[in-house]
Design a protein with these regions (language model features):
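Secretory/extracellular carbohydrate-interaction modules
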Residues: 193-314, 392-399
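Broad, structure-driven detector of short, well-ordered beta-strand segments within folded domains
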Residues: 288-300, 336-340, 383, 425-428
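Extracellular/virion structural assembly segments
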Residues: 1-194, 267-286, 393-399, 403-480
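Beta-strand-rich interaction surfaces with strong enrichment in secreted/lumenal proteins
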Residues: 44-46, 108-109, 245-252, 320-328, ...
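Flexible glycan-contacting loops in extracellular carbohydrate-active proteins
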Residues: 359-398
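Short tryptophan-centered beta-strand motifs in secreted/extracellular beta-sheet-rich domains
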Residues: 262, 327-353
Length: 480
């Protein structure tokens, strides 16, 4: 079957397929536009649109029995269904990439114990792409040669070397801007200042507290190179409640308006439970806010996020949240975050992909403390890893990988920095998605600037402020 197969989404099918036939329009369909003018015969030519490109593929595969063939057909149908268009490549023509998604039904022509399968694809992006390549910015300049036949949308990966108020990418015809340049007479300020960065690889500065919400403190917490983990949860105590180890530490300074980031892992196993909690305490040890992730269902793999305000005995606000697609937070390797700015609280939950991108994000809900009940300065943090007695959660299932706390500075009359040393932008001009350290931040884009394509031929791109940024531009050449 060498040279007769295909890949979809840069992966081969779950078993060998042979492409028997394919129908592809070798040139993307062109639809002419005409403008009808009353009183004038006919119409006036008004340019054209490039239509979608359909692809029909006929494949077959081997099976030992009719039932095995039908089972494989079900697997194949599920494998081809994707949320978004993905690269489709035929091994007979490896230099051509189609951004395709399955469309319509899968048709079969059954012969004996097996048969042929017809799969229909649609390419809403009708262009044919070639391989991806990158060009580095050198002292703020990138010379990009686009050998494709049409313009192509670039992806920029930009690393921040020093604090910036703006990021500009431009040519002699177009510009793209994030943030705002600061005139020399304007004040430039940091919106937030990092006051705690604890990798949780050591127990230094951490002590064992005496109280925990809705349960008991027991067992042992250890610091590993991956973060805090529970090696034991303690013997069951009656009446049964949530139990496990907890640790507490002071912040280097008390903080009023703040943001806290806590990356965690909570991996689900059926018939097990698990709970990770982070408390934000005032100087007297009262709980001001608490955020967590938990699996409280012993018969299901199901995680939910939670956010609570106040001590457990007089708590007036409890918020529980599942992902928009409920299983998406299972085997959670992601971020818990708390904001407090003025009297506005906002929790944040997100899975983090291996490439650092935040997905299945929940950040829309917020709470304004009109009664000012939860406004005391934050002086301490407490963490807990717990389970329900009788469930067999193991050490490897739960982990707190670190905690960072920033102080929000009062806005000054001036222009804020939008990024600092070590931050990374990824700007996908094709999708319009902009991420800063994996989080979508389209709000930074200057309203009057535009995403622009790389024209065929030689292109000169400029990156400013070039002494504070480094990066590269990535393109895929394409043709009709």
């Amino acid at each position: 079957m060498e040279g007769l197969g295909l890949t979809f989404g840069e992966r081969r099918p779950p078993f060998d397929l042979r492409v028997i036939e394919k129908q592809i329009g070798r040139i993307a369909p062109i639809r002419r536009k005409s403008l009808v003018i009353p009183g004038r015969p006919g119409a006036v030519p008004n340019g054209y649109d490039t239509d979608v490109r359909p692809i029909k593929v006929v494949v077959d595969f081997e099976a030992e029995s009719k039932q095995e063939w039908l089972d494989k057909l079900e697997v194949l149908a599920a494998w081809f269904i994707r949320e978004d268009p993905e690269p489709l490549v035929f091994e007979q023509e490896p230099g051509r990439i189609y951004m395709a998604e399955m469309d319509g039904e899968i048709e079969t022509k059954e012969i004996g114990i097996y048969g042929q399968v017809t799969i229909n694809f649609i390419c809403n992006d009708p262009y044919v792409y070639k391989g991806q390549f990158a060009t580095n910015f050198i002292e703020g300049v990138a010379i990009v040669l686009n050998n494709g036949k049409v313009e192509t949308p670039p992806i920029y990966e930009i690393e921040v070397l020093d604090s910036i108020t703006h990021l500009d990418i431009f040519t002699d015809k177009s510009y793209l801007r994030f943030g705002e340049p600061a005139p020399i007479e304007n004040v430039v300020y940091q919106r937030q200042t990092l006051i705690l960065n604890d990798s949780m690889k050591s127990m230094n500065n951490w002590t064992t507290p005496t109280e925990i919400d809705n349960g008991y403190i027991g067992g042992t917490m250890v610091a590993t190179q991956a973060g805090f983990e529970a090696t034991s949860f303690g013997a069951a105590i009656q009446p049964l409640k949530w139990q496990g180890p907890a640790k507490q530490r002071s912040l280097p300074e008390t903080v009023q308006n703040f943001r806290a980031d806590i990356p965690i892992e909570l991996l689900n196993v059926t018939k097990e439970t698990g709970m990770i909690e982070i408390y934000f305490l005032d100087a007297l040890g009262n709980t001001i806010a608490k955020i967590g992730m938990e699996d409280v269902w012993p018969t299901l793999k199901k995680n939910q996020g939670k956010f609570q305000l106040g001590n457990v005995d007089n708590r007036k606000l409890e918020y529980h949240r599942q992902a928009d697609y409920a299983p998406a937070w299972n085997d959670f390797k992601g971020m818990l975050r708390v904001h407090r700015d003025g009297n506005l609280f906002r929790p944040y939950f997100a899975q983090i992909q291996p490439d650092g991108k935040h997905v299945w994000v929940s950040q829309q809900w917020s709470y304004r403390d009109e009664a000012l009940q939860y406004m005391a300065p934050i002086a301490q943090v407490k963490v807990a890893i717990r389970k329900w007695p009788g469930t067999s959660t193991s050490q490897a299932n739960m982990r707190i990988k670190g905690i960072k706390v920033w102080r929000y500075n009062d806005p000054a009359e001036g222009i804020p920095y939008i990024a600092n040393q070590g931050d990374k932008f990824v700007i996908d001009t094709g999708t319009g998605i902009v991420t800063l350290n994996g989080e979508e931040r389209e709000d930074m884009k200057d309203f009057f600037s535009d995403f622009f394509d790389i024209e065929p031929g030689m292109n000169t791109l400029l990156l400013h402020p070039f002494d504070k940024l480094s990066g590269k531009v990535i393109i895929r050449e394409r043709s009709r």
